[in-house]
Amino acid sequence: MKYPISVQDFEKLITGKYVYVDKTDLVYELAQLNVCFLSRPRRFGKSLLISTLEAYFTGKKDLFKGLKIDELEKDWTEYPVFRIDFAGGNYAKPEELENKINNLLGNWERKYGSDELCQTISDRFKHVLMASEEQTGHKAVVLIDEYDKPMLDVIGTEQEQKNRETLKGFYGTFKEADKH
């Protein structure tokens, strides 16, 4: 019996034949919501849940064979998924947060196209979300892991205000682009 100690990747967990407590019926319920915010203590499986949602929304039906969600989901639609993981950076460094977001945006723009008129992070992200819907015919799914790390790294420092403004613009995109 293999226990998934520190395994945060759903595909690795399933294909590696690790012990898995099937709660995919709850994942199915969660996926029916338009917007969902989950806040849990450290080491509570948030990253694995994000990975599970990513596999679900990218239509990886084979990973869910024999699990509860396999009986519930009929369509297995593949959505454009934008996974953002802020866990890896040191956001106390100036420009680290903007560099991280710009790198993510650059990858997505290569996939879905860019618009030279979109110069700000929020405009670029909004354009990518709209372009992904136009190209796939499906609304985008945005999954964010460690959403608060860029702020936790800089509490009480000069960088705090800069990171707050960057995140405000970035997260503000969701309200503007809700229909995409």
Label the predicted regions.
Residues 1-180:
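Phosphate-binding site recognition
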